[in-house]
Structures are given as C-alpha cells and as structure tokens.
C-alpha cells in the first residue's frame, strides 16, 4: 500500500507544500514566507483573540521584579 503525500497550502502565498522532510519550512513553502508571517505577528497584524485586554503594566510590577 502506497502512502499518500499530505499537501497543504502555504499560509502566506497559497502555494502547495508537500508535508514531509523535503519541505523544511512547512507549512510555509520557503524561508521568505515564514519570515513574512513572523513579521506580521511581531507587528501585531495577527494575534490570538482574547476576551480580556492586558497591558504590560498589568502583568509586571516594578516594585518586586522577582515576584513573577
């Protein structure tokens, strides 16, 4: 029985990517598309939805930096 190759679309450009060792940047087709996606997350163009809005000051206290 021959196993089928799983194919996915690159989330950045839509090009078909074979899911396997021959595609080291999977699910992306290349390093460029991977870096474009990383940049979108870094610029906060993409984010995981949340019910609450936290700011940096809500999480960290300058009074006791070792507390967290």
UniProtKB/Swiss-Prot annotation:
How many and how are cofactors bound here?
Binds 1 zinc ion.
Q: Which domain of life is it from?
A: Bacteria
Q: Where is this region: Disordered?
A: 45-68
> Signal peptide: which range, if any?
none
Entry cofactors: Zn(2+)
Q: Which Gene3D superfamilies match?
A: Erythroid Transcription Factor GATA-1, subunit A
Query: Per the record, where are the segments of Acidic residues compositional bias?
Result: 53-68
Where would you find the membrane-spanning parts of this chain?
none
Q: Name one Pfam family in it.
A: YacG
Q: Which InterPro entries does the record associate with it?
A: DNA_gyrase_inhibitor_YacG, Znf_NHR/GATA
A GO molecular function assigned to this protein is: zinc ion binding
Record's keyword terms, sorted: Metal-binding, Zinc
Q: Where does Zn(2+) bind?
A: 10, 13, 29, 33
Record-level GO BP terms: regulation of DNA-templated transcription
Q: Which NCBIfam families match?
A: PRK00418.1 (NF001638)
- Which HAMAP family does UniProt cross-reference here? DNA_gyrase_inhibitor_YacG
Similarity comment: family membership: Belongs to the DNA gyrase inhibitor YacG family.
Function noted in UniProt? Inhibits all the catalytic activities of DNA gyrase by preventing its interaction with DNA. Acts by binding directly to the C-terminal domain of GyrB, which probably disrupts DNA binding by the gyrase.
Subunit organization: Interacts with GyrB.
Q: What is this protein called?
A: DNA gyrase inhibitor YacG
Q: Which organism is it from?
A: Yersinia pestis
């Amino acid at each position: 029985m021959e196993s089928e190759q799983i194919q996915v679309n690159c989330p950045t450009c839509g090009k078909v990517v074979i899911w396997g060792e021959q595609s080291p940047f999977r699910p992306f087709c290349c390093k460029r598309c991977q870096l474009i996606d990383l940049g979108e997350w870094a610029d906060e163009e993409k984010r995981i939805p949340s019910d609450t809005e936290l700011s940096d000051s809500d999480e960290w206290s300058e009074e006791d930096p070792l507390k967290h």
